[in-house]
């Protein structure tokens, strides 16, 4: 009995299952911004497909390791000031600094972990 066809079908099925959630693209905006102390700052992040709430927000200062600020889209990491907040689910997420402080000057970025390489 020739088993090549079922094996090929199984391979296609596994490929389809494993590929269903790969290559999630994240689009963050704005790419840069100018703001003053005391300003409310908002950054958005959009996923190319539904990632539920599997999103982190990080702060990185020059020469330093990234610091986790927000996990699961909206949960504040212990010790992070309450002026930082996150919201959203599915494909659209928002990160907010309610009142910008001088020490907040940094690079901020989102990271999805619904599907990791």
Curated annotation (Swiss-Prot):
It is found in: Secreted; Cell membrane. This is Immunoglobulin kappa variable 1-33. Keywords: Adaptive immunity, Bence-Jones protein, Cell membrane, Disulfide bond, Immunity, Immunoglobulin, Immunoglobulin domain, Membrane, Secreted, Signal. Residues 23-45 are annotated as: Framework-1. It holds the Pfam family V-set. Its main location: secreted. Residues 72-78 are annotated as: Complementarity-determining-2. Residues 111-117 are annotated as: Complementarity-determining-3. Immunoglobulins are composed of two identical heavy chains and two identical light chains; disulfide-linked. The keyword Disulfide bond applies. Disulfide bonds join 45-110. Residues 46-56 are annotated as: Complementarity-determining-1. GO terms for molecular function: antigen binding; identical protein binding. Residues 24-117 form the Ig-like domain. Residues 57-71 are annotated as: Framework-2. One of its GO terms (cellular component) is blood microparticle. GO terms for biological process: adaptive immune response; immune response. SUPFAM superfamilies: Immunoglobulin (SSF48726). Residues 1-22 form the signal peptide. Residues 79-110 are annotated as: Framework-3. It comes from Homo sapiens (Human).
């Amino acid at each position: 009995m020739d088993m090549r066809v079922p094996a090929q079908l199984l391979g296609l099925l596994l490929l389809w299952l494993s590929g269903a959630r790969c290559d999630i693209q994240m689009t963050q905006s704005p790419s840069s911004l100018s703001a003053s102390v005391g300003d409310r700052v908002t950054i958005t992040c959009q996923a190319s497909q539904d990632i539920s709430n599997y999103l982190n927000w990080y702060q990185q200062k020059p020469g330093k390791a990234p610091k986790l600020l927000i996990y699961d889209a909206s949960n504040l990491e212990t010790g992070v000031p309450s002026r930082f907040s996150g919201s959203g689910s599915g494909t659209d997420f928002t990160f907010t600094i309610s009142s910008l402080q001088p020490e907040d000057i940094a690079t901020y970025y989102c990271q999805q972990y619904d599907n990791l390489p």
